Structure formats: C-alpha cells, structure tokens
Amino acid sequence: MKVVLKLRADGAGMAIFALPLTDTEHLFVKHLAVGYHYPVLSNIEFSIKGGQKVVITGFNGIGKSTLLITLIGEIPSMQGRFKFSDQVTIGYFEQDLEWQEPELTPIQIVANAYPDMVTKDVRKHLARCGISSKHAMQAIGTLSGGEQAKVKMCLLTLTPCNFLIMDEPTNHLDVQAKEALKTALSTFAGTVLLVSHEEAFYRDWAQRVINIEKK
C-alpha cells in the first residue's frame, strides 16, 4: 500500500494526511547488531505494528542514527535480521543538513526532485511547510538550519509512504515549527519510528518509547 502525505501549514496548522493502515506487524527486528567496522549496538529486538508511533531514545553517540540507516538499507546489518511488511513504503527524514549542490534554491531542489511539478505547485508545497517566498529563492546553503529542515520536510511530504522514519527532526526547528510537527505526527494515520532526545516533543503522542541504553 502506498500513501501520499500532504503537509499543510496554514491557519489550521500543519497536518499529515494518510490512509488508514491495518494493525499487522510492519517491522520485525531480531538479535540485530549494527555498526560500521564493529557493532555499536547489538542484540536489538522489537516489533512495530501498523499505525503505531514509536520513539527510540538513548545518549548521544550510542548508535541510534546507525540503527536507522541500517533499517533503511544504507548500510548492512552486522548480525541478526529485520524485516518490513510487504505493504510498507518508507519515508525517511535524516538529521544531517547536507546538500549535494548547496548553491541551489529550495525551488530548484524541489523542482529537480519532481520535474513534472509546475513552479506554482513547487512554491505552494514549500509555503505549506513554512518556507517564505524570500527563502524559497535563496541558496539552500545560506539558509538557517531550521529553514533547511523545512525544505527536507517538504521533500518528505511529497514522497509516497506509509511508514515515517525520522532522525531527530526537531534539532533545527523553532518552537512554532516543533508544535506544528508534533500535531502532524500525532494525527498521522501511518506508522512512525522516531529518534528523539526531546521528551516534551513526543510524550503526548508516542505510544511506545524504546530506551536503547537498556538493550
């Protein structure tokens, strides 16, 4: 199943829309070890049902980001196994603000990613994610971390998915943007796996918290 997300940041607030999902198991993790040259985390076990909202916590450097990039297939696991349901389509938000071409504007970045989209719609989607007309025409590398994060969020909302994997999405956001994202995730009908160090951000809507330090 594929679900198209739309993010709105207007008078009604930011929202993510998705079709309802079954409550079958969407992710199964068993005896998983992750790392590069040696395991930084090992014997990780958990499962997530469709529609669940799960947060992973732990001290900085323990390997939370490494776990996520293993799950999305960027690096191989070192031991154990994991499996996503066949109906899962992943949308991934990484915390690093790195751009292959930092001289491009947000309009150009979105247009390059979605060449069939007309400029009017590109501007509309950026505006819905809180990007002003002025910032939409500036080089992405000159924008603040918060504005860059909003552009990444815009790209994510245009990606068909029903399972959001997010690595510290609030790192560069201001209070207003955090509140908007919190509302969006709490009302999202799909599955969420979030790495976060901000309990105030997730405690009102997360259904499970996995402290990776205790694994």
Kindly give the residue locations of the regions a language model identified:
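ABC ATP-binding cassette signature C-motif
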Residues: 19-215
